[in-house]
Amino acid sequence: MTRVRRGYIARRRRTKIRLFASTFRGAHSRLTRTITQQKMRALVSTHRDRGRQKINFRRLWITRINAVTRENRVSYSYSRLIHDLYKRQLLLNRKIPAQIAISNRNCLYTISSEIIK
């Protein structure tokens, strides 16, 4: 069987992979086989962490809202606030009240007191 000279095509493919892995440390940025393995691993990690990031931010927003609502009113909690928001048909996602809780706590207090009425 004759030898096939791949030419620039294989080199172009490898350099493309090397550019992706240029910030990796050690052999992970130098050796072609380990570069491809690490690239696959990195892409799997980014795909997984994109989903996990949404979960983590939602948890953070819930924690912030709950902390401010419990601080202002002793008997009031996050779950009761969200329930009252839905009862009043106020379409606020958890990101907006969390941002209000950080920047202006009194504003969140007035919103919650208006909902209770």
Curated annotation (Swiss-Prot):
Pfam families: Ribosomal_L20. InterPro entries: Ribosomal_bL20, RIBOSOMAL_L20_CS, Ribosomal_protein_bL20_C. CDD domains: Ribosomal_L20. One of its GO terms (molecular function) is rRNA binding. Keywords: Chloroplast, Plastid, Ribonucleoprotein, Ribosomal protein, RNA-binding, rRNA-binding. GO terms for cellular component: chloroplast; ribonucleoprotein complex; ribosome. The keyword Ribonucleoprotein applies. It comes from the Eukaryota. The keyword Transport does not apply. Coiled coil: none annotated. It is found in: Plastid, Chloroplast. One of its GO terms (biological process) is ribosomal large subunit assembly. Its main location: plastid. Binds directly to 23S ribosomal RNA and is necessary for the in vitro assembly process of the 50S ribosomal subunit. It is not involved in the protein synthesizing functions of that subunit. PANTHER family: 39S RIBOSOMAL PROTEIN L20. Belongs to the bacterial ribosomal protein bL20 family. This is Large ribosomal subunit protein bL20c.
